[in-house]
UniProtKB/Swiss-Prot annotation:
Any one Pfam family match given in the protein's UniProt record, by short name: VPS15-like_hel
Keywords assigned: ATP-binding, Endosome, Golgi apparatus, Kinase, Lipoprotein, Membrane, Myristate, Nucleotide-binding, Repeat, Serine/threonine-protein kinase, Transferase, WD repeat
Record membrane topology: Lipid-anchor
SMART domains on file: S_TKc (SM00220), WD40 (SM00320)
Enzyme Commission designation: 2.7.11.1
Lineage of source species: Eukaryota, Fungi, Dikarya, Ascomycota, Saccharomycotina
CDD domains hit by this protein: STKc_Vps15 (cd13980)
Subcellular localization, as worded in the UniProt entry: Golgi apparatus, trans-Golgi network membrane; Endosome membrane
Lipid attachment, kind N-myristoyl glycine: G2
Name of the protein in its database record: Putative serine/threonine-protein kinase VPS15
HEAT repeat spans: 432-470, 570-608
Organism: Komagataella pastoris
Amino acid sequence: MGAELSLLAPTAQPIALSVYVDFLSNIQYNKPLGTSRFLKTVKGLNDQGSIVVKVLVKPNSGLDLSEWVEKLEFLRLKLLDVPNVIPYNLVIDSVRAGYLIRPFQQRTLYERVSIQPYLEPIEKKWIAFQLIHAVMECHERGQYHGDIKSENVLLTSWDMVFLTDFAPFKPIYLPGNNPSQFSFYFDTSRRNVCYVAPERFLGEGTPTQYQEVDKLTSSMDIFSLGCTVAELFLEGSVLFTLPQLFKYKKGEYTPSLSGIVDNDLRNMIQEMIDLDPRKRISAHDCLRKHRGKVFPEYFYSFLYDYMLELSTPSDHSVGNWRFDECDRRIERIYNDMGMICDKLDVNLDLNIVHSFTEEPSQNVIPMTLRLPGVEPHIPQSSKTPYDSALIILNILLHSMRNTTHSSYRIKSCDLILMISEMLSDEQKLDRCLPYLVHLLNDPSIDVQAAALKYMTQLLLLVDYLTPVNVLIFPEYILPKLASFLSTTKGSYMRMIFATILPHLAKTALKFYEMAILLGSHVEKFELLKNFENLTIQLLIDPDSSAKISLLKNILPLASVFGKDKTNDIILSHMITYLNDPDENLRVAFIESILGLSIFVGITSLENYILPLLVQTLTDNSEIVVVNVLRSFAELNNLGLIKKRYKFDLIKVSSKLLLHPNSWIRLGTLRLLISVVKDLSLTDFYCLLYPLVRPFFEYEVTNFDWATLYPCIIKPIPRSIYTLSITWALKAEKTLFWQQVKLAKPDPFGSRNSTFLLNRNSKIGESGVVSNNQIPTSPEDIGWLGKLKASGFDEKDLWKIATLRDYIFRVARSRSNIPTQENNEVTMQQMGIYPRIVFFEKGSMYETEGFVTGSSMMANYRILVNSEYSPESLTKRKTVGGVNTNHTYSGANPYILKFLECIKFRHVLDDSEEFGPSIPSATVEEGHWKFEGVLVSHLTEHTGSITSLALSPDQQYFLTGDSKGIIRLWDVLQLERNGYATSHVTVSMSSSVKDIKFIENRNSFCAVTADGEIKIFRVEINSTSSSVRSNGSPHRHESISLLREHSLEGEHISDMKFIGPNLAVTTLSCKLILFDLRDMQIAEEIQNPVSHGFITSFDLDSSQSWLLIGTSKGILDFYDLRFELLVKSWKLKSTSYPIKHITVPPAGFTCNRKSERFALINGGTNDSVTIVFDVSKGQCSELYFTETVNLNTAIDNYEVLEVDNGEERTRTSVLATEVEDRSITSLTMLGSNQFLTATFDKRVILWDTGNKANSSALISKLDDFTSSFSSVQVRPHLMAINEKIVEKDPQDIGGPKRNMASANSSTFDLHSDIITGIAVIQKPLKMLILVDRAGVINIYK
C-alpha cells in the first residue's frame, strides 16, 4: 500500500467506528479491540456468531484497494485446506473504507502465556509444533504471512493453534531511521516488541533498486516465527525490542535464551533467528530435523492427525455452537482410550480387577474404571507422569463443559480419572479437580453423584502437595461440600454423599499432615469442625438410606475424629437407630458396630453397646436378631466380651434355640460354640452346660458343630409361634402372660420384670419353665385349645413358656410399628415431569389391490356345495407399513432419536382386508340344563374330522378332515331345520391339522400337516329379497384367500393366534411367529430337540409366559419377557405325549389363585385333566373319570424337573399294545367350567368352582348316572373323581329319559372317539361334537 499511507492517516478519528461497521449488512457493532492506527479493529456479531472486523479508513484523497482485494481472495483460496490457518474470509472495498473480516477467537498466544494454569513444557511444544506446521503449509503453497507474532496466533481452549491476520499488504521494507513507520504498521499493541526480520529495515545506503523487489520471503516469516516460539518458552519475555533489533542487525546485541533449559530447543530457535537469512532453517527442515528431539515422535505419527479429526466439525453438524460436536468428541475419546494410551507410549501399572472379582455394591470407593480397550482396574497414580495426556485432557474438558447430555458428562468423569493417573499430583489438583467440583452444580443427579465419587477417588490419588494447594480443603472443597449438602434433598444424592464423606475426611487429614511438613499453617480444629458438621447432618438425616450409607463406611470417619469424638458424636447418635422403624437401618447399625467396638474400646462396649444389643435380641424383625447373634459371636471371637458377661449372654440367647427361624437357631448355636472355645473344662460343665442342656435332645460331650446341630431340640412350629404372638396381643384376663416386677435388673441393666409362675415354683438356671409351673386362666385354656387345633402338642407348652418373654416383647413391638408410607421416589419428586407427545399414524405406501379381476366383487368366488382347489381362491397382497408423525417440536437430538425408535405394534384394525371387528358371543356362566336331545346328525365328511372351529359370533362353524376338506355350516339352518348341508367347501393340499379364527373377526387360519398355512376371510351377505320358507332371509357365504405361506419340509403340529400374529409349531421342535401383514417370520423359538417334537402350546393372557408340551411328555416353560427357557418338567413315572394345553381365561381360579394355571391333557395314559401351576411346577387339581383307580394313580402325578439335555424315553410308553385311555378333546366353557371327551366317547362337564355340580352330558350307560366328589390327597393337590352309580329305579324312564344316553337310535352316539367339542350359546345353547369317523352330532 505504500509507506505514504502513514503520513496520510488522520491522527484523530472524525467519525465513530460504529458508523463504518453499520455500513455492512448483517453485521452488528459490538466493541473496539486494540488501539491500532493503521487498521481499526472491532468485534462484531453476525448470524454465525462473533467476528473480527478490521477497518481501513480511506484518506480524503481516496485509495483504490481492488488489487489487494483480489490478492487476499487468492490467498484465502490457497489456504482454504490448511487446518491451522484462519485467513480473512471476507474482504470488502467501499468508497469510504476497506474491511477485513474473520471469525473471532477469544484467546491469543500472548494472553494464554500469562493465564493460569500455566502452560506445561509439553503444551508449549505442542503449540510450537502446530505453529511451525501451519507456517510450513503456507510456504509450501507460496503464501507468506508478513507479521507473525504472538498477538496473531489464536488458541482454542484446548490449545489448537490458528495463524491469522495475514499482512502481505503491509510494507515489506521499513526505513531504519524512522521508527514511526514500524509503530504505525507493526506495533499495534504498543508493546514496543519487534519481530520483523532485520533485513526488512533499510539503512541510508541501501540502493533504491533493492526496494523495488517488493516480495516477502520465507526467511522473513521464519525469523518472526522463531521470536514467537522463544516468547512462548520464555514465559512471555520478548527477544527483541526495536532498538535491540537494530543493535542485533549491527552485531552489537545477542538475545538471551538462557531461560530455555532444553539445548535442542535453544538450538532450534537460534537457527530460526539467524542474522543471515540464508542460514535460517526452513519450517519443513525444522520439523524434520527436530523430530524425536524437540518434538516427540507421537506428534508426527498420531497426535496431530487425531487432534485435527476431533477439532474438525462433522458434516452433519449445524449451527455455530455445534454442541453435538462435543458429544462426538467425548464418545470418540472414550472408545479410543486404549489406543490413545498405546500411541502416547503410556505404560500404567494397572491394579487390574479380574472379571471374576465381585465388587460389593456398598464399596463405592475405590472405584473400578472400565473403559473400552483398557483393562478394568482400580485407579492409582503412575510412578512416571505422562504430560502428553494433558493435550487430550484439554479437549476433553472443553467438550465436557459444552456437552448436551448427562451421559457424556459421566463418561467425561471416567476419562478425567483415567487421564489423571498419567498426570502429576499438581496437575491433578490444578487441571482436573476444578471441573469435577463444578459438576456438583449440574442439573442431573447422576452427574452430581459421579462428580462426588470421581472427585473423591481423584483426591485419594494425590500423594504430594504444592504450597499453593495446602488450603485446598478448608478454603475450596469443604465450603463446596457444605453448600452442596444444604441444597441437596434427593435420597440418592445424600446416600452417595454419606458414602464418600469418610474417605474425604481421611484424605483431608492426609493433606493436613503434608501441609505441616511444608511448613504451612493449617488449623486442624477448624478442619475437623467442618467434617463434624457434615457428619452430624447425615447422622440426623430423616432419610434412612443416607444414614445406612454412612454406617457402611463409618470406620474411616472414626479414625479421623479419634476415640473421644467418635464416642461423643458418632456413637451417641448411632445408638438411637435401634429405635428406628426401618429394619435396614437397624441391621446396618449392628453390622457396623463390630469395627466401631474395636475403635471405641471395651468401656464403651460394656456400658453402651452390649446392653443395647442384648435388648435388640427381642427385635420384631428376625433378620435383625440374626445379625445381633452374629455380632455377639464375632465380638467374642475378638476377645471383646469379658468372661463374666458370657454366661449371662448364653442364658439370654440360648432360649432362641426354640425359635422357628432356622437362621436364628443357627446363629445361637454359632454363638454357643464360640463361647465354649474360651472356657475351661470346669467352667463349661459347672456353669455353662446346665444353662443349655434343656435345649438338646441328648447328652453331648463334644461342643462342636457336627455334634450339636443334630441334637437341637425340635423348635416351635411357625404357625404355633404366630398364633402365640396373637394370643399375647389379644389376651386380657390371662395368667400365662401376666408379668411381675423384679427387685433388681439383670446383669445388662434391663428387664426388671418376669412372668407369673405357680406358687412355690422357681425358674431354674437355664430359664426353662416346666409345664406344671405355668399358671393358666380360663381364657388361656381357650387359646391353648386353638393351639391344639393347629397341631400343637400340649406337652410342648414349656417351649412357649420359656420363650414367652421374647414372644411378648415381639408382640408388643409389632403392635407399635407405625404404618410406613410408600418410600418410592417419584419422578416428580426428582423434578422430572412428563411431557406428552402425540403421534399421528399413516400408511407409508398404498395397499395394493387384488391380484386378479377388475373389481373387488370379481375376486370373490361363492363356493356352494362344490370343491375348489386352493389356486381357485383369490389372493390379496400385504398392507403397507406404518409411518408415524409426532408433535414434538424441540431440537434435542436424543429425544428425537428416541421418538424415531418407537415401534407401534401392528393391530388388525389397520388392515381392512381382515374384515371388521364383530362382537363375540357371551358365555353364560352357571349350571347348564342339558337335555341331551340330538338336533342334527351330519355325515358329509368322508374322512376323519380333525378340527372344529366356531365363529366368534357363533353364526356358523367350520370343520376340517384328514382329506384336506374344510366345510362351513350355518348354525341358524341347523337350529331351525334339524338338518343341513355345508354351505361352502374348501380343498386344501393335505390333511387339515387345525383351524382357528382370528379374535373377533370372520377370518380364520387353516394349517395342514405338510406345512401349508392359509388365511381366509368369510363373507356373509343376507339378502332380504330372498327369504326361506320359515321367513328368515337367505344368507350367502363366500370365502376369500388372504394370505398363504408354505413351510417347506416342515410338518405343523399346533397353531394359535397371538394378537395380530400367528404362532405355529412344527415337528422340528420350532415355534414360529408370523406377522399377519406379510406372513414374514417375526420370531422363532427352538425348543430342545431332546424333549421331543412339540404337540401343543399356549400362552397366558398377558403373553408373559409360554408353556409347551412335547411328544415325550415334557412341559417346557418359557419366560417371554427374556425369551428364556426357565424350567422343564415331566410326570414322575410316565412319558406319554402331551396332547393338549389350554391356558384358561383370566377369571379361572384354583386355591384362590389365578393367572398361573394351565389345563393339560396327556403326559399320562389316564383319563384325567390336570390343572398345572406353572409358578410352582406342580399339579394343583386332577379331574379323573371313573376309569381311573385313584389309589394307584395318584403317585404318578408327582412332577420332576428335567434337564435340557435329557433324552431318555420310557420304552414302555412306546409299546403299541398299550391302549390310549387319555382325554381326546377339551374346551373351556366360560372361566370356571370346561368340557372333556373321554376315550369311551363320553362328554363330561367339569365345574371347577363347585366340583359337585359337575355332570356327564353324553354317556352310553343308560341306567347309570355320575356323581362327583373331591378329596385333598396332598397339601397342594386335590383330586376330583367321577363315580358311576346305578340310577334310582324311580328315575328310570322319568323326565330325564330324554338324555342322549337314553335314545336308542344308532346315530345318537358316536361310534369313534370324539375329536372336537364346541358349545353354541345362541340362539339356543347346543353342543357340537365331531369324531374320527367323520360324524357331526349336535345336541341341545
